[in-house]
Regions:
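C-terminal scaffold of the Radical SAM
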Residues: 1-11, 16-292
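A short, conserved structural fragment
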Residues: 305-315
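Short, amphipathic alpha-helical interaction segments positioned at domain boundaries
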Residues: 322-337
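Short amphipathic alpha-helical interaction segments
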Residues: 291-305
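Minor-groove-contacting beta-hairpin "wing" of winged helix-turn-helix DNA-binding domains
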Residues: 316-321
Length: 337
């Protein structure tokens, strides 16, 4: 089914090479290495791989064994992303995770000797009843394991989840700010560079898949619940998502919805993505990815500069610290009235 789903896009991508593959959504590490190898071979048979393709697979620390990791590397996986979330067993239980802190550390040890080019640890802060010291202790333990990449997210309560029905006591805004400020300092001192709102990496280890997404690049969506974006030769931009129901997917009902990104919405969508990254925004990329000229946003840009939301050079726009604090107001400037 994944192969048939992929086949539908072959004509649309005009033989463009793949620069990254992200195998996520649940626990793909339950797949055998043989299955992953087969999947990647089928993708490569249809779409060329770039020379330094990054192939990331999500893994649950509770489902990892040494042989499996080595098998994934042999199959072509270059990077593993592990959903650690916390090193505090009480907090992990509260989050409904199936692993404990000892298993998480064991999984990291295996990742280090498996031949992977890189690996990421997903960590959360702002957990129920979490103190500043507990949050920083999680970070210290993560830093000690020396992952090349760390994703450090604040817990958000999603609708229709256990926490949405029975809201826990979460740290207040002041406590969250202290956690972020002191945590950011810990990470920086340990040699990690923040390159996106929630992502830190050692130099040269940024996640290419992340970068492409936040730079408003294209990505295919293959499999249940996947979301994608494609730009066509005529300049049209299509966003699409796949059915969330495995039964429907197995019946060949792949597509859930698709919509064209109208020209009026492109500036907003572009900046909403780009301003998540800390790097400067090349003006040429605005034109390349949106198909719009810079003059289309001149008034909004001038106002944003006046408000100290961004600074401008001949070739770049850069969001300021002030702009990050007022991101919603900055983005609202680009909304189509």
């Amino acid at each position: 089914d994944l192969e048939a789903d992929l086949e539908k896009y072959q004509a649309s991508i005009q033989n463009r090479p793949l620069h990254s593959i992200f195998i996520g959504g649940g626990t793909p590490s339950l797949f055998s290495a043989e299955s992953i190898k087969l999947l990647l071979a089928e993708i490569q048979r249809r779409i060329p791989f770039s020379e330094n393709i990054e192939i990331t697979m999500e893994a649950n620390p509770g489902t990892v064994e040494a042989e499996r990791f080595k098998g994934y590397v042999d199959a072509g996986v270059t990077r593993i992303s592990m959903g650690i979330q916390s090193f505090n067993d009480d907090k992990l239980q509260r989050l409904g995770r199936i692993h404990n802190a000892a298993e998480a550390k064991s999984a990291v040890s295996l990742a280090k000797v498996s031949g992977l080019k890189s690996f990421n640890l997903d960590l959360m802060h702002g957990l129920p009843n979490q103190t500043l010291e507990e949050a920083l202790d999680d970070l210290r333990q993560a830093i000690e394991l020396a992952p090349p990449h760390l994703s450090w997210y604040q817990l958000t309560i999603e609708p229709n989840t256990m926490f949405a029905y029975r809201p826990p006591t979460l740290p207040d805004d002041d406590a969250l700010w202290d956690i972020f400020e002191q945590g950011h300092q810990l990470l920086t001192e340990a040699g990690y560079q923040q390159y996106e709102t929630s992502a830190y990496a050692k130099p040269g280890f940024q996640c290419q898949h992340n970068l492409n997404y936040w730079r408003f690049g294209d990505y295919l969506a293959i499999g249940c619940g996947a979301h994608g974006k494609l730009t066509f030769l005529d300049g049209d931009i299509l966003r699409f998502s796949k059915t969330k129901h495995p039964k429907g997917y197995l019946r060949g009902e792949y597509l859930y919805e698709e919509k064209n990104v109208e020209k009026n919405d492109r500036a907003f969508e572009f900046f909403m993505n780009r301003f998540r990254l800390l790097e400067a925004v090349p003006k040429q990329e605005f034109e390349y990815y949106t198909g719009l000229s810079q003059s289309a946003v001149k008034n909004q840009i001038d106002f944003a500069i006046q408000q100290n939301y961004i600074v401008e050079t001949l070739d770049f726009w850069q969001i300021t610290e002030h702009g990050k604090l007022f991101l919603n107001e900055l983005l609202a400037l680009f909304l189509d009235e």
